[in-house]
Amino acid sequence: MWKHAGKTIRMTGALLVLASMLGGCGSEADERTGTAQAAAVEPVSATFYVYDTVATIKIYDPKATERHLDDIRDLLGKIDLELSRTNEDSDLYQVNAEAGRAAVPVSQGTFDVVKMAVRYAKETGGLLDPSIGPLINLWNIGHENAKVPDKAQLEAARRLTDYRRITFDEAKRTIKLERPGMVLDLGSIGKGYAADQVSLYLREHGLDSALINLGGSSIVAVGAKPGGANWNVGLQDPDQSRGSQLGTIRINDETIDSSGVYERFFIQGGVRYHHILDPRTGYPTQNGLKSITIVSENATDADALSTAAFVMGLEDGMAYIERQPGVEAFFVTDDNAIHATQGLRDRIMLSSALYRMAGD
């Protein structure tokens, strides 16, 4: 997690978010005014290679400086030292290494994130389980040696996936995994948490127009575009390679987060196996969904909900999202229908003839 966070490229120019970042929305006059004012503000920008993908920070504020970008790079480096599964110096690595043996003292940030992950697990009945690491390791999807595990291996890994076996000591600020072989994996909330931390930094420094793009799947719009127009975010076509879009959505001072079968997968025996695993079965989720996109004020919530609602499926996932205050979503099903919550239907503009809004 957060590999190569120290490698930074300074850049200006076109903004790439999901498939693309287009002009502002609103009335036509507002759009022209907002777009013109946005063009007059040259963003201060940095691109990091993090989380095995490219992330871009663009700050559209005349007060922004290179120092702010350096601070954000350092902030992401700090998160790496807390939440990386592969960095041997990280809190999470040490907690996993001591599984079944000892409680591990961690930073306040790590403690809070893991507690949040357990809260999400409780709220979703274990469908979003931060102890899913053994299953993720077993499938190894996204790497060259990914393959379908045998049933005995799968059952052994599934038995180790149990968030109820994660214990916390508030006074000592320690985390313990009760069973040997348990593995924490915060991939379902890690990018969202990091995006929230960057957003908090920007707001605390009075930088109120910015875009945070972590890997194309987790986007935070801090404020509106210069001039007050909305941002138009391109929506990934789940049947195409990264950069192809099915349409756009308008956001303003919000987060958008997507999960889908297109991100990481392998094919064995003519069957496609994607990376979104169902802790109940140990297998990739198969429920007729291609992708889900969440719009929320909070990036950590959006990151978690996009995975949890995907595992729930269309009917249960939609009902769950509609119970969450301040959260909207749309689901893309295998028949290319888009099922959106009421608050999103008028904000999605389709550009691909292959997709349609359900109910139209």
Which sequence ranges carry the predicted segments?
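Mature catalytic core of soluble alpha/beta enzymes
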Residues: 2-360
